[in-house]
Regions:
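Conserved ABC transporter NBD signature motif
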Residues: 27-30, 53-54, 60-79, 140
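ABC ATPase C-loop
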Residues: 158-159
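Conserved catalytic motifs of ABC-family nucleotide-binding domains
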Residues: 162
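The feature captures the beta-strand-to-loop junction immediately N-terminal to the Walker
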Residues: 38-41
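Catalytic Walker B motif of ABC-type/P-loop ATPase nucleotide-binding domains
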Residues: 166-170
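Q-loop/switch helix immediately C-terminal to the Walker
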Residues: 80-83, 87, 92-109, 119
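Conserved ABC ATPase "signature" region
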Residues: 101, 115-135
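Hydrophobic anchor residue at the start of the ABC signature
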Residues: 155, 183
């Protein structure tokens, strides 16, 4: 359904010269919510995310993407969306605050000094880096932020753009389980507080991370095996004869299921 301010996808397809990579992928996302795109390796998660972010790779796109009912063009993307890549692209020698000073100056040049400082502190607070704001990002040669805090900083830099839609590629990849839970927790809070759409790909979420999703789309061989409320996924698969065992990780159960049993009809 195309509700106001929803981000609908209508029968998206992606193809190369050899084969179709996605088949009639449809759905919608509302502001203030987090959509997780799940699927085993090769299911089409990266291809779908590339299409949503208008990346010209992974084949020839077909279909429609709309935001607020309007076509999601490159101009619209630059105006309303931001992306966070799987691997952080930070300046090792700059502090958390330095990164956000540059980001706010770039994306919000109209702000005066006082408003700019307030925006920077709001971003730092929104990702929980208040006590790390003077720490350098660091790298393998320079001590700095932990992997989880680097991911938080990358998200804060993207939020400086004040997007209506935020895309993230594997935001919990490469961080420990505690950091993964915290990242998904504050993403959910950010979506609600700023009334933005957050769409992320996730490979194999533990139950504690899965609990942070509002909605999820499960892909298998480029097709949608499930799209709906995350907390209704187990019930749906039970209704079609695949009842999850008690106390199981629903995401893990479903990913194992679609990896071996889901076939297109």
């Amino acid at each position: 359904a195309e509700g106001k301010a929803a981000g609908p996808l209508d029968k998206l397809k992606g193809s190369t010269l050899d084969k179709d990579l996605l088949h009639d992928v449809s759905g919608s996302v509302n502001p203030g919510s987090v959509l997780a795109i799940l699927g085993p390796s090769g299911a089409g998660k990266t291809t779908l995310l590339n299409m949503l972010t208008l990346e010209k790779k992974g084949g020839v796109p077909q279909g429609h993407i709309r935001v607020d009912g309007a076509p999601f063009t490159l101009h619209k993307y630059n105006e309303t969306a931001a992306s966070v890549e799987q691997f952080d692209t930070l300046w090792a020698s700059l502090t958390v605050k330095d990164h956000l000073v540059h980001a706010v100056r770039l994306y919000q040049p109209q702000l005066d000094a006082a408003a700019r400082d307030a925006a920077i502190q709001d971003l730092i607070k929104s990702v929980g880096l208040e006590d790390q704001q003077d720490v350098k990002a660091g790298n393998e040669f320079m001590r700095g932020l932990s992997g989880g805090n680097k991911r938080r900083l990358s998200i804060a830099v993207a939020l400086a753009k004040r997007p209506s839609v935020l895309f993230l590629d594997e935001p919990t990849s490469g961080v420990d389980s505690a950091s993964a839970v915290m990242i998904m927790s504050f993403l959910k809070k950010i979506a609600e507080a700023r009334s933005i759409i957050i769409v992320c790909t996730i490979h194999q979420p533990p139950a504690s991370v899965f609990a942070g999703f509002d909605n999820c789309m499960v892909l298998s061989m480029g097709r949608v095996a499930y799209f709906g409320k995350a907390d209704s996924m187990g019930e749906y698969f039970a209704s079609i004869g695949n009842t999850p065992p008690p106390d199981t990780n629903i995401a893990e159960f479903v990913l194992d299921l679609v990896n071996t049993d889901f076939t297109p009809e």
